[in-house]
Amino acid sequence: MAPEISVNPMYLSEKAHQAPPRRAYVTFLAGNGDYVKGVVGLAKGLRKVKSAYPLVVAMLPDVPEEHREILRSQGCVVREIEPVYPPDNQVEFAMAYYVLNYSKLRIWNFEEYSKMIYLDADIQVFDNIDHLFDLSDAYFYAVMDCFCEKTWSHSLQYSIGYCQQCPEKVTWPEDMESPPPPLYFNAGMFVFEPSPLTYESLLQTLEITPPSPFAEQDFLNMFFEKVYKPIPLVYNLVLAMLWRHPENVELEKVKVVHYCAAGSKPWRYTGEEANMDREDIKMLVDKWWDVYNDESLDFKSKIPADAEETVTKSSILASVLEPEMTYFPAPSAA
């Protein structure tokens, strides 16, 4: 059950003179690798479930123009953002590329939108979730994470065997000097309200916050701890839940699938990694491809055909390279 939530006043100070609400989904893209396929799949998935709202792609400057054109051709709103870096540190991130994910903080500066739903590029939406935009303001909504995979081996929860997904199985030891940690969300999907005040506070807080293994996810959990409200896991099924906590999963009811487990990215899937030969995983990968390959879900441009560029979407998609990521050095936050 969610704890008592105290409302963060910085959310409320800008509400008095707002224009009519404007809503959008938003995702993040960096580099010239194949994650663009994930964003294309997400855009088509949102169309399939008849979402009423656009998909904004917050992208770093190193995303090539050919990938930007792919996304424009799929009806995405392309927004370039500058990178955000944590303070200088020697921390070892759970994944090397996580340092780039601090740049997600820029989406709080998209003040033309009153509310947004963030979705990672390796997520697919299989049922309409537009109703989440109607959740009460002034809170941060996301799905609780699972601590059972080896990527959490650095954590106290993992060493104890404690997981918030089933706290009754392994309870928090009574002899621990500290109480159980606060509820912790997965930052691959969340509902939030852009705000210049929140944005500035995020950047200022980052400057004095030591980085940690899960990068911006740890940081956001710390920053929004007092206003976090958990939502059901149907809104962000982390695939490890299928083998770690199957009793908590009703797969037929899941609306949002997060292909974050090692080897589960549909556009790279081989079935060779651990747990990837499961029938439920194969089914979910096939579902993603069904959406991605469905040409009826391609964006129908309102621009006359003779005004469109001569480069076709199919020729651009065919040029997407194998995975490659441009990494930035990590200077102090700015």
Swiss-Prot record:
Compartment list: Cytoplasm
Official protein name in the record: Galactinol synthase 4
Gene: GOLS4
EC number(s) on file: 2.4.1.123
Reaction catalysis annotation: myo-inositol + UDP-alpha-D-galactose = alpha-D-galactosyl-(1->3)-1D-myo-inositol + UDP + H(+)
Cofactor(s) demanded: a divalent metal cation
Induction summary: By methylviologen (MV), a superoxide radical generating drug.
Segments forming a coiled coil: none
Provenance organism: Arabidopsis thaliana
Family: Belongs to the glycosyltransferase 8 family. Galactosyltransferase subfamily.
Main function: Galactinol synthase involved in the biosynthesis of raffinose family oligosaccharides (RFOs) that function as osmoprotectants. May promote plant stress tolerance.
